[in-house]
Amino acid sequence: MKKLLFILLLTTFSFAQRKIESHQIINKEKIEGIINRIDSFPTKFIVPRTVDVWLPSNYSKDKKYSVLYMHDGQMLFDATSTWNKQEWMVDDVVSKLNSENKIEDIIVVAIWNIPNLRHMDLYPNKPYQLLSKEIQESIQTEVKKAKFPFDDKKINSDNYLQFIVTELKPYIDKNYSVYTDAEHTGIMGSSMGGLISMYAICEYPNIFGKASCLSTHWVGFRDFENNPIPESFFTYMEKNLPNPKNHKIYFDYGTETLDASYLKYEYRVDEVLQSKGYTSENYKSLKFEGENHSEASWQKRINIPIEFMFGKN
């Protein structure tokens, strides 16, 4: 989407005895829908942050919509305001899929990250707790060597999911014309957003019926020799993946830059999913040769997971 322009239309919602104010953002040059922005969504679980609710241009209260929750919300719609001048172009892709009658009607709820808290908000807590204290200490040694901002005492993903499930989703369900069941609710992200999306469908299978995890960051922070982190995720998944009869999961990866470090772990993803009864009907694990770890690469292929999750039968 080209640069977003603010329309001074303010809407105030009352939710759980709190007023949540949103304003519309519209691209006047080429409208690909409307964004209702909440600048600081009130929450008791995490640091308040911006939430964007994207609606198709023909949004109507007279019909119901499925909902896709996405992480790193500031990277999804407007390249002119992102740190690397790239975007997912979610509005354009969903609008195109709609115009081609390939997917159900959906809205997108985009949760912004707070850069210095992102890793702690999105790193799945329970897989990390499966590691022994000795292994956790060895990981922190590697973290210090890499000078990486990963403090395992501050992992906050359980609270992040609590925010989505108990505060954000009830607000969306109340204020938009949406289906509220798991069958019509998906969650999607890339890198750390891929990890938290996997974690979300495992922790809340009655809330999320679909998850898409692009360039999933199995290595945790950076890869190193005998890295125990990836296997902790796979062990967790073996115990917690939801019933394949009513859930869908999508994974993918490129082959360049950071994505190259995921190649050696993808066979384990396949092993785990297949051992839990997932088949081509409800699971995909795709390789994208030559693609790297960037919004530009994810933008090229997000139509695939979106259609996999919300495609018309």
Regions found by a protein language model. Name each.
Residues 18-313:
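Non-catalytic cap/lid and distal C-terminal segments of serine-dependent acyl enzymes
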